A protein has these predicted regions:
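Long, low-complexity intrinsically disordered regions
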Residues: 1-136, 140-142, 148-171
């Protein structure tokens, strides 16, 4: 499809669980048939006996593991869940997480403190990120990494299309 409709078709098929993002092929992420790629078995509702709190806790744990360090507000923005629901779920996984020790908003991630200690300083080697990379897309507040002018260049018109990005020294 032309004119950006391909993204809409892909999003619709993913939201209907017909397709899903599959393995990385070395240059980009493949799209796969959901029934062939996703594990079969119990549904999320069955796994958590219909209790949303542990289901939200598991989703929060996975988000912070893959996207962290991030705030609870980042997760709320990403999932569109309420902060109240997220705060009720946090105690179920808090022992598996570490926070940056700052006042609100705290940034959470499993193994965060060890990771920061091991890294010491941020790498000065540039990172070449594809469009729609989670470094930019995964956070509601992106000012930790860019100015408003840079944001306009990466997300022109704030229209939901994210261009390729070069990151150096966390900026």
């Amino acid at each position: 499809p032309q004119g950006g409709r391909g993204y809409h078709v892909l999003a619709a098929l993913i939201s209907e669980t017909r397709l899903c993002y599959g393995p990385w092929n070395g240059t980009e992420q493949d799209v796969a048939l959901a029934e062939q790629w996703l594990p079969s078995g119990r549904t999320v509702a069955e796994r958590f006996d219909g209790d949303r709190v542990p289901a939200v806790a598991e989703l929060l744990r996975r988000y912070l593991t893959s996207h962290g360090p991030a705030t609870l507000r980042d997760f709320a923005w990403w999932t569109k869940l309420s902060l109240g629901e997220i705060r009720r779920a946090l105690p179920l996984i808090v022992d598996d997480l570490e926070a940056d020790g700052a006042a609100e908003p705290a940034y959470w991630r499993p193994g965060l403190l060890d990771e920061v200690a091991a890294l010491g300083r941020a790498s000065s080697a540039p990172l070449l990120l594809p469009g729609f990379d989670e470094f930019v897309l995964g956070y509601q507040d992106r000012t930790f990494a860019m100015t408003e002018a840079e944001h306009q260049r990466i997300v022109p018109g704030n229209n939901g299309v994210f261009k390729k990005t070069v990151v150096q020294g966390a900026q």
